[in-house]
Structure formats: C-alpha cells, structure tokens
C-alpha cells in the first residue's frame, strides 16, 4: 500500500521502529525519492476518496451498455414495423436513426473510460445521443412537426414505441448518474 511504502521510505531517511536510517551517505538520493513517495501517497489518497463515485460510474456504464442492446432490439422492431406498413420515408428514416442511436449510446458507454481517463468525446456523444433518441422516439409516437412525423396510428407500433421510451428513461437515469458524477 502507499502507506507502507511511505513508512518504509521515511524510515530509510529518518529511521523508525521498523527501519534503520540509511545515514548521510544516501541523503541526496533519499532527498529525490521522498518527494516522489509523498506525491504517490497523496495521489493514492485522492483515488481512494473517489472510490465510491468511481464504482458507481463503472456500474452505471455497464448498465447503460447492457440496456442499449435491449433498446436496439425494440428499435429494430419499430423500424421493421414501419417498413412493413410502407410508412412515409421520414418515418422510416427516423426509425433507422433510432437503431443507429441505440448502437452509438452503447458504444459511447463502452468508450467512456479510456486508458487516459474519461473521453470527452464519448461524454459529449452520450448526452447528445440520449437527447436525440428521446426527441425522435417521441416524434414517432406522438408526431412532430419539426421532424415531419405523423403520430403512430397502429397499436403495435404505439406499444413498441411506448416500451422503448420506458426503457430509454431507465437508461437516461443511469447516464445522468454518470454525467452528474463528472461535474
């Protein structure tokens, strides 16, 4: 642990009940090592202080990733229903966008944490894609002049879109927890 490392290095420099000091012959080298160990101990404490938040973010990311595959399945059903109904091109296109957005939401969740830390691009895309998804799904269900979509008329499509929006809310809640912990 960082505490053990710090105790041992400080013991080598000054001596303690477990370690005998190295003496003046090594004071220059110890003068270089001690600040590095102190910084490592401080950084380890900072990470440990964030352990609960980091664990929550990791759990939420896995949840969003899992939920995106469920969203994808329902979005593909909606797209298929629109094709079977010979829906207008705008509705077929919007249903196709839902399919694409579910894939990107999952991808953004998987790319969220990189070796370098949090990916700003993935954070931005996750928030943007979630907003777009809701707008399009609601437009397909209730109609949208802005998106040039008529409200869904058949019961099966309405049922699938309602289920999709319910699943979306669960995903958005998890994502909000992730995005909120980054601020």
Task: Identify the function of each model-found stretch.
Residues 1-183:
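Hydrophobic alpha-helical segments
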